[in-house]
Amino acid sequence: ELSLKAEFNRLINVQKATLDNLREAVVVFSADGRLRLHNDAFAELWELRKDNLADSPDFDAVVGLCAKLYHDRNVWTTIKSRVTNPSPEYRQQDQGVMRTSNDRTITWITQPLPNGATLIAFMDVTAARKVETALKDKNEALQAADKLKNEFVQNVSYQLRSPLTTILGYAELLESERP
């Protein structure tokens, strides 16, 4: 029995270390909607004190703590339905994007677990979105510059063609007048 208990404690420690070393903010709610597990990244992402999550609060209490950064009740209601509604149509993976009041972009995904539990993972993708936006802006600027260059070359080509045609005409005329 002692070896079973030691093995159990070891597995719990491995699980906790694994969760705490994830970049993603992870929470697990049981079928009754109570918080069962979370990692440090979750508390950091939502700017929560660890003692706020210590007594296994229910989903609504956790949302109340997170609402200072993200206020859209419709999204929280959608996530809650994935956590607390046992119906098979709600026990499915879902995902979305949040834009928080502190200008961060967070993606979220829900994943049903055995025994009615639900895992929710949040990831701060602000930096990636900023890079994506910068690359799109740069691409648009390069396309606009290329268009301007093409228009300029066409215009210069036309402007040069007209005088050259005239000069060629005079040259042919002069050559035809030579004895």
What is each model feature region?
Residues 1-15, 84-95:
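PAS-family sensory modules
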Residues 13, 19-32, 44, 99, ...:
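Long compositionally biased, domain-poor regions of proteins
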Residues 65-130:
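PAS-family sensory/regulatory modules and their coupling/dimerization elements
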